[in-house]
């Protein structure tokens, strides 16, 4: 992040390798590991990614984030507990666009998260309360009368993730041990 691009150039910054258990700019991510082929830094975590986003946004108004919110295996985890904070962080930095890489079909609840991210793109001033109401609405639309049980399951899964909050896992869906 040293040279400003031409004003007609959009820079796409791929957030490959972020920790999926912690929001980008919350200083909660304590694991540090190598990120092959991306940087020469020997240790990186979400703080580094947050600094890089700030740096790029300081150089250009045309930053697009490639956000990996993957659940590429049959797993219980989602990033619903960090996605709101991450998108608000991007907004505060002045990010112009967001490309979400995620599974939208098949098993799991990944499509629920992509739905809520799309809705946040249309309403970037969404509050956390509106986020929760929107999530409930998506679940009700998709699961009908049983939506509250799915919400209870999600909340339990997210609470369990926070029980192991000192653990980090890669945005591709595996623990970074």
Model region roles, listed by residue range:
Residues 167-177:
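Histidine-centered catalytic/metal-binding microenvironments
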Residues 149-153:
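Peripheral, non-AAA+ core regions of ATP-driven protein-machinery
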Residues 1-136, 141-142, 155, 162, ...:
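Catalytic-core regions of glycoside hydrolase
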Residues 156-157, 168:
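Residue-level signal for alpha-helical context at structural boundaries
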């Amino acid at each position: 992040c040293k040279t400003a691009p031409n004003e007609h150039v959009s820079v796409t910054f791929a957030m490959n390798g972020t920790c999926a258990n912690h929001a980008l700019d919350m200083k909660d991510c304590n694991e540090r590991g190598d990120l092959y082929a991306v940087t020469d830094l020997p240790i990186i975590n979400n703080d580094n990614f947050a600094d890089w986003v700030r740096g790029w946004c300081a150089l250009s108004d045309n930053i697009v984030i490639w956000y990996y919110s993957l659940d590429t295996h049959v797993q219980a985890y989602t990033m619903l507990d960090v996605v709101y904070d991450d998108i608000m962080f991007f907004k505060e930095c002045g990010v112009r666009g967001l490309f979400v890489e995620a599974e939208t079909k098949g098993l799991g609840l990944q499509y629920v998260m992509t739905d809520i991210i799309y809705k946040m793109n249309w309403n970037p001033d969404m509050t956390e309360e509106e986020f929760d109401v929107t999530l409930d609405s998506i679940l009700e639309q998709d699961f009908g009368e049983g939506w509250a049980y799915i919400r209870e399951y999600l909340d339990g899964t997210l609470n369990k993730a926070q029980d192991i909050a000192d653990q980090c896992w890669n945005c591709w869906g595996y623990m970074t041990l």
